[in-house]
Amino acid sequence: MERIKHAATNSSLDRDGMAAVVDMYATWCGYLRRCAMDPNASDESVDLADSGLVAALEAVQVWGERRFGSAFQGDPNYRLERIMIYHLTEKHGAIDEAREHWDKLAQKELLAHDYSFWLSYYMWEMNLLQSQKGTGRSPTPAPAARLSRTPSRPASILQRALQVSQLNWPERVIEIYVKHCNDFESSDVLQNALDEVHNLQRVIAQRRKDATAAQTAQAEAHARAYESQALEASAAAAEAQALGKQQTGDPQDDLNAGVKRKWEAIASGETPESATKKPKNEDIGVNAAAPNSDQKSQENQPAKRDRENTSVFVSNLPSDVTITKVRQYFREYGHVNNIQLKHEENGKSTVALVEFRSVEDAQTALIRDGKYFGDHTISVKEAAGITLYVTNFPPSTDDESLHRLFGKSSNIFGIRWPSLKYNAHRRFCYVSFRDAESAAKATGLHGKMLEGKYKLSVQYSDPAAKKAREGATDEGREVHIKNIPQEFDEKEIEQLVSKYGTVKRVRLLHNMAGRSRGSAFVDLETKDEAERVVAELDKVKLGTQILKVELSVSAKFKPSARETSVASESATCNGGQEAPDEAKGEAGNEARGNLHLRSFALLGIPDTVNITRVRSLAEPHGHITKLKLYPEHGGAIIEYEDETTAGKAQLALDSTQLEGHTLRVDAVPQLFKEKSGVRIDRVDIAKRRPPKPTADTTSATMGKKAAPTTAPALLPAFVRRPVLGGKGVKHGLGFSAISATTSTKKDGQPTATNGAATSSTSSDTAPKKSNADFRALFLAGKSSTDSKEKVSEEKSKASGAPASVDKPDSKPDDTKMEIDVVVNGH
């Protein structure tokens, strides 16, 4: 037994905590106590128990402090201490030493807050008194002077328990305390106990009342927070809907380059007036009624996913393992949200990143560390601290660029890009590493400058952390100036605004011809300077225009991204001189006329690809004058400078692969009929199967509306089949007459009958044969038959074979032949 105990102490029992360590030592101490309590036990067994119990208590304490530090408070069930106390009491009678162990346990908060510990201490004292004294009204007699002030030892234990303010069940201790004083103590002690209990009950009642009030206040605060969030969400939804209506236009109207549209103003940063209008009373009523429903929906929604703290790494899996097998393996340890598999470089094993629903499920799954998965011994480790939030990198960055940035030896497990459906200007990603050391090393790139103007941000991912938006627009440092004269450029605008603050950047909007649109965005150094610019320049006359200056408002709903290229060649002519108005008008009309030939839709683009990457894909095939990305529809509209370039680009881009998706080229109106694919990054949600192709879907894909299916259309077709013995005119054995007449066109040619075209033959136009013609044909056939018979007889005579027996002449009567021809037609 001792050898087994030593082998157990040398193993990693504390891998999953101290539970296994305490269980092992409790079993060992129980064995020592039973050996010592045996009536026939030797002195060696008793000495072994004395030393073994003390050594076990010290070993558990040292082991726990080494594992958890000062936070270790011992076994909540104090199993080793109880074995030690009963050993001292029953075997040695060392009551004072046993009480010292009880007092040490009472000093630990973990046990001092538990009423069951104090009841166990009380029962030990009562059993001890009953065993030491057989008679007497009171188990602890005392002088009369001490009866009114000093309670007995068991009562003092209960009184000491009632002094703990965080006792989990004080009512139970009060009940036993009053019962003990009523049964064993004097009247003075009982009266003092009742007074003490009365005061204590008042304190407990007030404490419970304060706790209830605090809970009620907390619940009301949460309700107000939910209500404010619901109001903000409804207001944001209304604003997004208004912006979406203004941004969404007729796709066909988008092809007219000469017409200004509101959604172009939104894409360039301008805020339409309708977005700043107050909602109507009906909208306010709807939004006011929304919080209750939103609050209920938020309560019913599951908790937010926390991939960073609910995932584990499972390594050394078989190379042919599947997601289903891994999910079945961990199913009994918790709910699995998602599983990602990646083959090792050697190709002999696979590593999996398993995401659970809660942190407790992930901790439970660690039990499988070192266990078998088939014939492989797997390793299960925590995946905390391996995911980094990376942002502010160049817009053209992709997976390959990130691998080069962090280095090939960075041990990257996967990269997760956000969806651009509702904000096409997002530029961040999540990078997961194989271990925490690699992630910590990658954070050293935080603050690195890329391409001379992008300051990289690399931080640990924390779903609970919220960061205020940065930038001139979100910080209130950007002003929007409208109605600027056409002859003003960016330098003149900067000189105008610099009188009221420090200008950081000026962005003047241009049209397709490169001319000013009379609108600009100016970034200043502080918010106060921006407000001063608005106060000083708003409604000021500049040249012949009245300026309109206001603070820029960022649009939260950005379902598309737009880029244009200034066509300088079309805007100027005659060696750099500006073209006359007549030339500009003719060029504009020509451009609008062939716009549909220069534009096309590129479909099948993933919703994680931004507009810069689409441009880098399409720009090698020619100069792009306009590009607009629609992540919600999974495509983009590309406009080239001429028809030839657009045609070559369509041939080159069709069937191109982009991140595992096959791109295809189609007309622009088809883009707005497409929907971007739904990404499901969970294994606990069944993926939708694509519908089977039917007649309705086929007609819909061809751009035609399918006719609605009605009940008569579902009936089987009625087929007429010929039946022997049916009624009708009996014809002869020859050819039957054609009942259906052939309809002819105006030029005399036959038309289609029953859907099949009837071809004109010589029999259609040839005259009909008479009886004389049939008679001549018959006689000609008979003469040819007689000549053949003579030739066969001559051959048989030459070969010596017997001649064939001639049959009697059965020449038909000519008159009968004529009758048959007239009646039967042959």
UniProtKB/Swiss-Prot annotation:
InterPro entries: Nucleotide-bd_a/b_plait_sf, Prp24_RRM1, Prp24_RRM2, RBD_domain_sf, RRM_dom, RRM_dom_euk, RRM_occluded. One of its GO terms (molecular function) is RNA binding. It is found in: Nucleus. Keywords: mRNA processing, mRNA splicing, Nucleus, Repeat, RNA-binding. The keyword Oxidoreductase does not apply. Functions as a recycling factor of the spliceosome, a machinery that forms on each precursor-messenger RNA (pre-mRNA) and catalyzes the removal of introns. Chaperones the re-annealing of U4 and U6 snRNAs (small nuclear RNAs) released from previous rounds of splicing, an initial step in reforming the U4/U6-U5 tri-snRNP (small nuclear ribonucleoprotein) that can reassemble into another spliceosome complex; this step involves binding U6 and facilitating the unwinding of the U6 internal stem loop, followed by base-pairing of U6 to U4. This is U4/U6 snRNA-associated-splicing factor PRP24. It comes from Ophiostoma ulmi (Dutch elm disease fungus). The lineage of its organism: Eukaryota, Fungi, Dikarya, Ascomycota, Pezizomycotina.
